[in-house]
Amino acid sequence: MKVVQINTTYGVGSTGRICVEISQMLNAKNIENYILYTQGEGDCTLGIKFAGSIYKKIQALKSRIFGNGGFNSNFATKRLLNELDRIQPDIVHIHNIHGHDCNLSMLFRYLKKKQIKIFWTFHDCWAFTANCPHFMMEKCEQWKIVCEHCPQIRRTSWFFDRSRTLYNRKKKLISGLDLTIITPSQWLADCVKESFLKDYPVRVIYNGIDLNVFKAIRSDFRTQNHITVDKKVILGVAFGWGKRKGLDVFVELSKCLPEQYQIVLVGTDSTVDKQLPNSIISIHRTQNQQELAKIYSAADVFVNPTREEVFGLVNIEALACGTPGITFRSGGSPECYDETCGSVVDCDDIDALEKEIIYVCETRPYTKEACIRKAKEFDKNTRYKEYIELYERINVAGTERG
């Protein structure tokens, strides 16, 4: 069995790390596998790069001008298809392919012609919309019937609204693929069943974390940042702070929480810093997971006021470090918690969120042991083993039904 994964990134970001971790598990079973990617850092010995950053910027500009995202990048896609011809995979596992590096028409026609078994992990909602990875903040449900007059069009196109055309092209191209869809949350699986992809088999495989890295450890974070022992640390972590991730919520919380509550945000940058009051501690983005585990371990409660989230891996990372969480009732984020380790409040209900933060910090209803126990359900070795088992089952049985 030969497996090829296709993703925009290699080793960076959540999807890039997931690809590498799946590849490592395949290597451990002596299964030949490759990762085709366009952006990566560090040792990319497991991967094959098929487009560069300058090329991608040109394709992004073309998409903005002509409003045809997903249908440019002919040269890069030709290189990708040449690699597939060379490798002759039994399985192609698609992750994110909306980074201005892949032409859907060329890729899907090739896969249909070659009758290759496809797994597609949806890390967002882009596959069944015209061109939107998320739609919750807009409260848009056009994707259930047909996308048109897109309320988010300026995010992807400067001049033309081709949402109806893109939606119909995508629907036609995906039809007839030998496809199994994988989602990292039940919420997203439910969305798929309301989309034009409803007749395809869908499997939920939650994302996993490395429990050897994310664990409760002794931390000097408070000392380094001059946080006194009497203060409660309210932690937020995101990589791409903005309204979608709830940056404005933390600004509001800083105004209403008592003085003994210290908000810490991780994953910021100089632009985000300008939007924050001096009372919030800002930690710029880091790829050092050990340092991140120390910060999680130092917090009293992890708060994720996300408004659009497919799953919420940061929730699990915090739990693994013994820190309970609170999240908005949005997307798949609530699926990370149960009554033993965290709580959920309605989206945008700042008053309820403030009260829940104070309740969790003052009464400590969730033990460190319960949080860690919940996190063990998301051990990457267990979760990504499900992918390998699915590959092997499909490879033996042929096309999975239902």
Residue ranges, per PLM feature:
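Conserved donor-binding/catalytic core segment of Leloir-type glycosyltransferases
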Residues: I182, I227-K245, V251-K255
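Acidic anion/phosphate-binding donor-loop and adjacent secondary structure
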Residues: D190-K193, I209-Q224, K274-Q275
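Nucleotide-activated donor-binding/catalytic signature segment of Leloir-type glycosyltransferases, i.e.
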Residues: G267-Q290
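Short alpha-helical donor nucleotide-sugar binding micro-motif in glycosyltransferases
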Residues: K294-A299
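Aromatic "clamp/platform" in nucleotide-sugar-dependent glycosyltransferases that forms part
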Residues: R307
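Short hydrophobic beta-strand element within catalytic cores of glycosyltransferases
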Residues: P324-T327
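Conserved acidic donor-binding segment of nucleotide-sugar-dependent glycosyltransferases
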Residues: E339, S343-I350, Y359-R364
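A charged, aromatic-enriched C-terminal amphipathic alpha-helix characteristic of glycosyltransferases
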Residues: P365-N395
